[in-house]
């Protein structure tokens, strides 16, 4: 049995610190190359956040090529018995997107370090500069559709009583006053709750303690299918993570996000 098996999805520095030597642990740092070089959690392997995305217009947030994912997870030493702990330094956007990737490859043994590197540092935990070597070459992966919503799927679900579209962008993008695509505004019926509003800056960017009640009041509830997006499914990595951490049973990331929806000729929008 894993030493992580009794822990919730979201863990604290005090949970991780005594488990850093666990043989099943793959610790993933999604900060930046510069931040990682300055000091990271001991044993952490750096993943450039850009490697979690397709990176090409018009929808850079789509999944990377399967071969690129197989190379990435080979470097990390992916194996069925592994437990991932994932962190970043921005409150959970990139870490949440990586957790979405783990769901896509069908691997569900994972945790998010609440608050990420800022919380680890605030708790006076140790940092290291040692860089672990890549473990191996490409590994064959099976990609699963369930964690993802395509544009066509989202469009087919619009208006359903059991759907909540969680728009993680800022209010000006949602309202259409800030335009980052051919079309401005939002997906019809979408609920706007900006990703950073779910973080507590007084607690080193940890997920705010009342997030379940906030989402309930907004109508983003566990009885609905929650499809979350932003511009490139980076910010909505955090909102995907939050819904998963709260135990919502039907959560999907719309990886195309507004960069796809807002540039497609056949998508409806509201302002």
UniProtKB/Swiss-Prot annotation:
Q: Name one GO cellular component term.
A: cytoplasm
What is its subcellular localisation?
A: Cytoplasm
PANTHER family in the cross-refs = THIOSULFATE SULFURTRANSFERASE
Could you tell me the keywords of this UniProt record?
A: Cytoplasm, Detoxification, Repeat, Transferase
**Temperature-related properties:** Optimum temperature is 20-32 degrees Celsius.
Gene Ontology molecular function terms on file: thiosulfate-cyanide sulfurtransferase activity
Q: Give the reaction(s) catalysed.
A: thiosulfate + hydrogen cyanide = thiocyanate + sulfite + 2 H(+)
SUPFAM superfamilies assigned to the protein according to its UniProt record, in alphabetical order: Rhodanese/Cell cycle control phosphatase (SSF52821)
Native organism taxonomy: Bacteria, Pseudomonadati, Pseudomonadota, Gammaproteobacteria, Pseudomonadales
Q: Does the keyword NAD apply?
A: no
Query: Which InterPro entries does the record associate with it?
Result: Rhodanese-like_dom, Rhodanese-like_dom_sf, Thiosulfate_sulfurtransferase, Thiosulphate_STrfase_CS
Functional note: Catalyzes the sulfur transfer reaction from thiosulfate to cyanide, thus converting cyanide to the less toxic thiocyanate. Contributes to P.aeruginosa survival under cyanogenic conditions, and thus provides the bacterium with a defense mechanism against endogenous cyanide toxicity. Is the main cytoplasmic rhodanese in P.aeruginosa, accounting for 90% of total rhodanese activity.
What EC number(s) would the UniProt record show?
2.8.1.1
Q: Describe the location of the Rhodanese domain by residue ranges.
A: 21-129, 159-270
The active site consists of 230 (cysteine persulfide intermediate)
Q: Provide the phenotype resulting from gene inactivation.
A: The growth of a rhdA-deletion mutant is impaired under cyanogenic conditions and fully restored upon complementation with rhdA. When P.aeruginosa cultures are treated with exogenous cyanide, only minor differences in viability between the rhdA-deletion mutant and the wild-type are observed.
Q: Does the keyword Coiled coil apply?
A: no
In practice, how is this protein used?
Microbial rhodaneses may contribute to cyanide detoxification in natural environments.
Please state, per the UniProt record, what induces or represses the expression of this protein.
Answer: Is constitutively expressed during the entire growth cycle. Expression increases during exponential growth to attain a maximum level at the onset of the stationary phase, slightly decreasing thereafter.
Q: What is this protein called?
A: Thiosulfate sulfurtransferase
Supply the source organism for this entry. Pseudomonas aeruginosa (strain ATCC 15692 / DSM 22644 / CIP 104116 / JCM 14847 / LMG 12228 / 1C / PRS 101 / PAO1)
**Gene Ontology biological process terms in this record:** response to toxic substance
